[in-house]
Structure formats: structure tokens, C-alpha cells
Design a protein with these regions (language model features):
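Patatin-like phospholipase
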Residues: 1-371
Length: 371
């Protein structure tokens, strides 16, 4: 199929807290539907649409980001759907043939609470790192995101190659940058910092990357460990789950175009402490749109939102879409003010003023949502 005949689909997997099973279920169903569609086209069956639709980018935050990495690890293998269970025992039975189900439903056992409340992590770390024992996250990540597990490097027809996958991170140190004013002296410079961070991967590419996309190959193992750590970092819900340390090559971080205005990081390796990526960017659809615009050469929103001309669209999968806030109730009590303050900081951190006008228009062809 000619490149300009491809319709590019970008998946945005929103933060899901404990509803990762919803996101994983939608993704599992979508992949199965695309697989069946491909088979029907190959067999030239009647009444089958012939469009060439491919998933070209997957971006996610928190549980959505974790699901995105897990999904990227299974695309080169046969994805076996889980038969609809008829009893609770069947629902929680181990389903290793389907990692999306394995990650969010049967997990590591029928009852996860004893693992999360176990205090062995305190004895091991000699300190409290979170309210819950986060070791189960490590066990799941090691079980589901493995190096050299895929012998087949080919993608199915509904996946664009090379597929791009990215996660949002909340970088606790942040990236400093200087705001210069005329008359500034070296002793009186004005510095700020941003804490948005991204782990960006491009699957199955051997080329030397000139942009922010780190090569990721589950067949050779290249950068699989980095992807696994990034997946745990984007899902590190603060206080309840421990923060995560992520090491990346400095040159890979300095190539991230969405952070070009910050000061370049120094040294050969950049090590960060991170918490849940959804804190600052829970629905990173603006980055998904950036990637789609590059692939289609359609940077004009009037073109990519026009159903007569668009060559791509964003599919936002969001278990908890935001609702209109209730009327604010004045309450100057200490605890209420603290809750208001946290809500204010998170809300402002997630705000995307530059794209608010288009995000509220339900008639646009360039974006859809499953919630």
C-alpha cells in the first residue's frame, strides 16, 4: 500500500488508576477487531471495507502508559482473546496467553491485598517508601515485559512500522531553564523548572535515531529494561506506590523536542526520580497529534479535522473522563484548604491552554473518545 493511502490511528491511553482493566479490555478488543478486518481483506470477502488503517503511535500516562508498553511487547506474537468467563474462579484464573488480561485482571493471584499490605518491603528497604508494598509492580513488570521474548520482528498489517510508543513522566527534579532579561547579571538570573518528562520509543528500528525516539526491540532486548522501568515510573501513584528511578542516555533526553526550551542535561547518563505521569499530563493527546501531523504532513487543524481530507485521527481511551466541576464551595478549614490546594496544583499542571478550543469541539474528525 502506498504511504499516502494509509490512514494513521493514534491511541491515547489516559491515566486509569485502578481501572487499567478497562483500558486493556478496550485495547484488546480493538486489536482483535483490526486482526479480523485484516483477515477479511486478505480473503477478499464481500462487504469488507478496503481502507488501510494502521496504529502508528501509542501514547499513555499512568495505567494507560503501562498498558501501552505491555501492548507494544505483544504485537509481534499471536494475541489470543480470553474466552468470556462464566464464574469468578474463571475470571481470576491465570491467562498467560493474553498479557493485557494477565496484567490487569488475574495479575499475580486471586487476592492482591495481602501482597500490597505486606511489610516485607520495609524490612528490605529499611525505610517506608510508600503506603502500599510496591513489589507486586516489579513482579508484574518482570513477568510481562521481557527481553528476547519475541522471535518474530514483523508487525501485523494493522500496525504501522516503525510504531512509536511514549509515556508521560512526572520528573521530581525537573528541567531548569533561564528566562533572560535585559540588564540581567550573572548573579541575578531568573530560573524556572518544568517537571513534564517523556520516555519515547520506536519499535524495531536499527537506524541511528536523530530525534527523541529510542530504539526498542523485544526480540534483541534493546532498551527493554528502560521501557520496563519507564512503565513502572509512569504508574507510580504518589504516596501509595513508591517513586521510581529511571536512567537514560543524556543524548536521548536532550533530543526530546517538547523540552527544547529547557537547559540541556549534562553527562553521559541522566538519572531521574519519577512519580505518576498522569499528575501533570494525564491525556497526552497533543503529543499523539504532533506525531500524526508529522506522518501525514497535515499540520493544519482545519485539514486534519475535516472529514473530507483527514488522514489520521486520535482515539482517546479514558476510563474516567473529566466532568464539569461542581460549584466551588468556600471552606477555609485546614483540611479542606489542603485538598483544594492539591486539586488546584494538579488541575493547573494538566491544563493545555493552547489546544482548549479544539478539544471541546465534538464535531472534529481528528479526535474520538471511548470512555
Amino acid at each position: 500500500m502506498e504511504e499516502n493511502k494509509i490512514f494513521h490511528l493514534g491511541l491515547c491511553l489516559a491515566g486509569s488508576v485502578s481501572a487499567g482493566s478497562y483500558t486493556a479490555g478496550v485495547l484488546d478488543y480493538l486489536l482483535d477487531a483490526l486482526k479480523i478486518w485484516e483477515e477479511r481483506k486478505r480473503q477478499n470477502l464481500p462487504d469488507t471495507p478496503t481502507q488501510d488503517v494502521r496504529i502508528s503511535v501509542i501514547g499513555g500516562a499512568s495505567g494507560g502508559g503501562m498498558t501501552g508498553i505491555i501492548a507494544s511487547s505483544i504485537l509481534q506474537n499471536e494475541i489470543i482473546p480470553v474466552k468470556f468467563p462464566t464464574s469468578l474462579k474463571e475470571i481470576l484464573a491465570d491467562q498467560p496467553q493474553n498479557k493485557l488480561y494477565n496484567a490487569w485482571v488475574d495479575m499475580l493471584g486471586e487476592d492482591m491485598f495481602p501482597m500490597m499490605l505486606d511489610t516485607a518491603d520495609i524490612d528490605k528497604n529499611k525505610e517506608i517508601t510508600s503506603l502500599l508494598n510496591s513489589d507486586f509492580i516489579d513482579k508484574l513488570a518482570n513477568k510481562l515485559v521481557k527481553a528476547k521474548e519475541n522471535k518474530n520482528r514483523n508487525f501485523p498489517g494493522y500496525i504501522y512500522s516503525p510504531l512509536k510508543v511514549f509515556l508521560t513522566l512526572t520528573n521530581l527534579a525537573g528541567f531548569p531553564y533561564e528566562i533572560s532579561y535585559r540588564g540581567n547579571t550573572t548573579l541575578n538570573k531568573y530560573y524556572m523548572a518544568v517537571h513534564n518528562d517523556y520516555a519515547c520509543f520506536k519499535l524495531n528500528t536499527d537506524e541511528a535515531e536523530k530525534d527523541e525516539w529510542m530504539p526498542l526491540d523485544f526480540a534483541t532486548g534493546k532498551n527493554v529494561e528502560t521501557a520496563r522501568l519507564a512503565a513502572m515510573a509512569t504508574g507510580a501513584f504518589p504516596i501509595f506506590l513508591k517513586s521510581r528511578v529511571l536512567a537514560r542516555e543524556t543524548r536521548e533526553v536532550n533530543k526530546i523536542r517538547w523540552l527544547k526550551y529547557v537547559d540541556p542535561v549534562q553527562g553521559n547518563e541522566y538519572v531521574t526520580q519519577n512519580i505518576d505521569g498522569g499528575i501533570l499530563n494525564n491525556e497526552p493527546f497533543e503529543i499523539v497529534r504532533f506525531v500524526l501531523n508529522e506522518l501525514t504532513s497535515q499540520p493544519d487543524s482545519t485539514i486534519y479535522n475535516d472529514p473530507d481530507f483527514f488522514k489520521s485521527t486520535i482515539l482517546l481511551i479514558d476510563p474516567f473522563p473529566s466532568e464539569k466541576p461542581a460549584d466551588f464551595k468556600i471552606d477555609t478549614g485546614f483540611l479542606k484548604t489542603l485538598a483544594y490546594t492539591i486539586n488546584c496544583l494538579v488541575g493547573q499542571g494538566r491544563a493545555k491552554p493552547g489546544i482548549l478550543a479544539s478539544s471541546v469541539n465534538i464535531d472534529l474528525a481528528g479526535q474520538f473518545m471511548i470512555a
